[in-house]
Amino acid sequence: MRLNAPQDFKRCFLSRKRIKNVAFTLHYVENSGQIARLGVNIAKKKIKKAVDRNKIKRAAREAFRKGHFKGIDIVLILKNEKFYDQTKCFKMINEVFNDLMKR
């Protein structure tokens, strides 16, 4: 399921729980339900082509789906476009989600 409402994004940012790597920041907060939700934020300023932004979003959704998370809201933000190479980017996304599963 996806995060859509601005107040849900705000709640994740205010929780101060986050995981960082070179290219991404992942904010998370527990929610009251049993459903995990994901929001992906990739600025057009950082990745110009919509095709590339969508590839990153699809990779994030796939890593999220494979993680089998329950009762958590997650927001993934691209913070550094210099590291945008498709294979590196997908590895970094998986790395961030694996770190979250360990916590």
How does the language model describe each region?
Residues 1-103:
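Positively charged, solvent-exposed patches that mediate nucleic-acid binding
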